[in-house]
Structure formats: structure tokens, C-alpha cells
Amino acid sequence: MQKSPYYETTSQQLYNGYSYSNGERFGYEGSGGGGGGGSYGAEVTQDFGPSCSVRKPGSTTGGGTGNVSPTCMKTNPADNNHGSAPQSNASILANTKIYPWMKESRQNSKQRQQPNLSVGTTEPGESPGLGGAAGKRARTAYTSAQLVELEKEFHFNRYLCRPRRVEMAAMLNLTERQIKIWFQNRRMKYKKEQKVKGGGSGGGSGGMNSPSPPATTTPPGINPGPLPHPTTQPSLSQSNNMSNHMSMMGSLQQTQPAYSQYPPPHLNHSLPHQAPPHSVGLTMSGPVSPQCYQSNHSPCPPSSAPHPVPMGNHVPHPRQGPPHMTNGLPASPLEVVSQRQYTPPAPGPSPTGPGPGHHGLTNSYPECPPHHTELPHHQYSTPMSVVNMNYCVNVQTQGNRLNSAPKLTHL
């Protein structure tokens, strides 16, 4: 009987939820000595409850009679449910209604939607996975041989007709739609390349192909006329325009203080029909003859200081460069011819007042040296020693004035 406390403690620890009172625990005790053994067996079987379900409710151990505990009278609920489980599951499945959304899954919905979208939108010869305006079309991977053939065809013809498209589709193992889309993309790429090429090289191509005209320097305040083309001959009107511009520049130089005293004022009002001396040598537009040259020069100013007479377009200043070079450019034939150099005359009375020979003017021009009678036509850009003629003017009195030049009727 020493083991009974041990079993009581272990039974309480293992089955805390099934704690029994003392009256229930010892309900099977007998009156005799065998009752001790019976109480031991009953105690063990009550502690480990599955043995109670095997016994009958009215049976006792050791032949003794005792009170039957209510726990042993109860049947095991697990044994009752074990037989009725299949029946209850079948009844639950039969009573519940299964809706379509219960069977839906993400993978099943994708598999069911893909055939529905591709039906009715694919072309002949195209797989269902490629087509469909609503679905995403797969990217076509072209081989190098296909790209070479497509590029060759695009080089010769940028727009394909239907028979040629069918022929290329059969030859390259592609669909008509793939070839059509490739040509559309290739045309857009070609337009973009042409636009970039035209915008980048448009500004520099014009300057590289067209020759630039030579740079010319003009004095401030003068508006030069249109320059003639290098391959065309200058016309008469262009030469007249050039002579007018040169005469305007000569009139600008007339206002300089160093040359403001030439020509004398009494000669200006005495010859009203003659053009100004600065513009006489500028109206010639052809070969210059000695007679024309002699008739166009202005009278020698009676001055004691050696100053060149401003006759032409560009008169060389003492601080300027050579007389045949103006502003770094070679002088024109008209400029070189109009430039003359005179020797200083003998000192005499002041030319401001009218002299006794003012109305007569019977003296003739001085003679030129014999080696300067002819003016070569091909040496327009030669130095001043060849073109400019040196005159020996011998003015003895105030009345010795140069005769007026005749009218120029050939111009």
C-alpha cells in the first residue's frame, strides 16, 4: 500500500483537468482484505481513464459491491465521435454550396485569360502568344541573316508592296506583320538620322562649299555698291558706280586741313562749266591717252612748300606708305593715273587776289618729257616713277596761269 500515494501524485500531475474527489477515487473498496487489492486496481484504472470505458457500469473488482462513480458511467466522447465522423463530414459538404470564386487562383486566372485574349486577334501563321492588341506582344528577336536581308531591301525600297512582303515573309520565315512593323520602325529611324545630319552640318556646309569673297576695306561713311562676281566682266554701269564712289571719297579728302587751300578760289568761279578737279580723273573708264591725261590734270598750285596735289581717289600722305598702295591693297588703274607729283614752283605773290592775267589765261600747258608721252596700258600697278609724270613748271609772274582745259566731249 506504499505505492498508492505515488500514483495519486502522478495522476494529479498528469491529469489536472480530470481531478476526482476522495469519495469517487475509493468507491470500489471492498470490506475484506481483498478490498485493499481491489482498491488498488480501481485506483489505477480510474487514474488512467481509458480503462473505465472498457468496464461495464455494474461490474466491480474483487467481487465486492460498491458505489459506481459517475465518471465511469459516462461514455468516452472520442469513441462516440469516431464512428460518426464520416457521416458528419459528408453532411457538411452536402450542405455547403461552392461558388466559382472559391475555385479561383492567380495561376488559373492567367491560364484562362490568355487564350481568350488571343482568340480572334491573331493573323494566319502567327502564334497565339504573340498577338492581341489588348495583350502585350512579345519582342521579336531577328537573326543576323534576317537583318541583313531586311536592310538590303530597305536600301532599295523603303516601302514594301504586299506581294514583296509576302515573298520576304516566306523567305525569312517571318510573318507579314513582323516585316511591316520592322519597316515602319526603320523608316522612323532613317528620318531621325536625316534630321540630325541636316541640322548639325547645315550651317557649316554652306561656308565650306561656297568660296568666300575677298575682304575689302572702305572708309567710314561710304556705302560701297554690290561687288561684281569674279567670273563676270564689269559692265559700264558698274564702272560708273565705282567712279561715283571714288569721287565721293575724293571730296571727303578735300576737306582735310592740309589740302584745304587747293585749288585757288578764283579758279573755281572762273570755270563754271568744268567739273571739279578732284573728280575729273575719276570719270575715265577705259585706256588713258596722253591727250586725255593732259586735259584732265589740275593747275599747279603756287606754293613754296612741296605738297602733292590731291588729284585722285587716294592721295598719298607724307606719313602713309607707298603711293601705289592704299590701306594695304593695290591701287586701281584710275587711282594710279590720277596721282601726280609736281615740282615746287618759284616763290611769287599770294594767289588769293585776282592777278592781271586772270581773264586772259593765254598760256599753254608745259611740255612733257619725251620718254613719258605714252602711257602703257599694262603697267597700271607700277611704281610712281613710271606712272606719275614730272612737269617742269616755270611760273615767272602772277599772270602766268595755265590755260583752261577744253570740254570732255568723248565721255
Swiss-Prot record:
- Gene Ontology MF terms: DNA-binding transcription factor activity, RNA polymerase II-specific; RNA polymerase II cis-regulatory region sequence-specific DNA binding
Which stretches does UniProt call biased (Gly residues)? Answer: 197-207
Q: Which CDD domains match?
A: homeodomain
Transmembrane feature ranges = none
Chain residues forming the annotated DNA-binding region:
135-194
* Chief location category: nucleus
The record's region (Disordered) falls at: 51-90, 104-138, 192-377
Q: Which GO terms describe its cellular component?
A: nucleus
Protein localization? Nucleus
Show where the record puts the motif Antp-type hexapeptide.
Answer: 98-103
Q: Where is the composition biased (Polar residues)?
A: 67-90, 108-121
Tell me the Gene3D superfamilies matching this sequence.
Homeodomain-like (1.10.10.60)
- Signal peptide region: none
Q: Which keywords label this protein?
A: Developmental protein, DNA-binding, Homeobox, Nucleus, Transcription, Transcription regulation
Q: Does the keyword Transcription apply?
A: yes
Q: What ranges does the record list as Low complexity composition bias?
A: 235-251
Which segments show compositional bias classed as Pro residues? 211-231, 299-309, 344-354
Q: Give the record's GO biological process terms.
A: regulation of transcription by RNA polymerase II
For the keyword Transcription, the answer is yes
Question: Known InterPro entries for this protein?
Answer: HD, HD_metazoa, Homeobox_Antennapedia_CS, Homeobox_CS, Homeodomain-like_sf
UniProt similarity note: Belongs to the Antp homeobox family.
Descriptive protein name: Homeobox protein HOX3
